[in-house]
Amino acid sequence: MWLTVKLLLGRRCLLQVSENEKVFMLKRLVSKQLHVPEKQQRLLFRGQVLADNKRLSDYCIGPNSTLNVIIRPLEKTSPETPSQPRSQSLWPQLNQILLKHFSPQDAENVLRRLREDHRKSLQRMNLDDLERISKVLVPEGKHSGATGSTRESKGDMEPRRNMKCNLAHKDGFKREKSPGK
């Protein structure tokens, strides 16, 4: 079966694999095609992180499915190196600004509401939202994308709606035929 594997900034490749392939083997193929080290890869299918020891069929991944690759940052090798002090967090800075315009109690209430709205907005974000943000923040050609030869695809390939997956995942995930089709 053919799978599309897509990096956050839009690079993608088509890989031919078996549905019984283990996730760690797929990571090896992705590493060769997109030049992303296996240890830095986090593969996602429909928002679910794939475990290395599971098979693709355990996640009901079928032909023409699209997987996303999130690249983990490199781990620091020297723990003795003190980390650079970060700039002050957004919330204390925002609190200082609010205190200039509101009473302390009102500023606290406004800040609490802003934090709650911010948290809710982040929870609603999906990978497409992150990709759009990354394209704005990292102009085309400036990211460290893959340079190897890959077979480019045109647009996302939607999974087949009629595919029925009877493999019950340990978390109870079960793909059924869409209602109304």
Curated annotation (Swiss-Prot):
Superkingdom of the source species: Eukaryota
Keyword check for Plastid: no
Designated name of the protein: Ubiquitin-like protein 4B
InterPro entries listed in its UniProt record: Ubiquitin-like_dom (IPR000626), Ubiquitin-like_domsf (IPR029071), Ubiquitin_CS (IPR019954), Ubiquitin_dom (IPR019956), Ubl4_C_TUGS (IPR041421), UBL4B (IPR043317)
Gene Ontology CC entries for this record: cytoplasm
Gene behind this protein: UBL4B
A Pfam family annotated for this UniProt entry: Tugs
Keywords linked to the UniProt accession: Cytoplasm
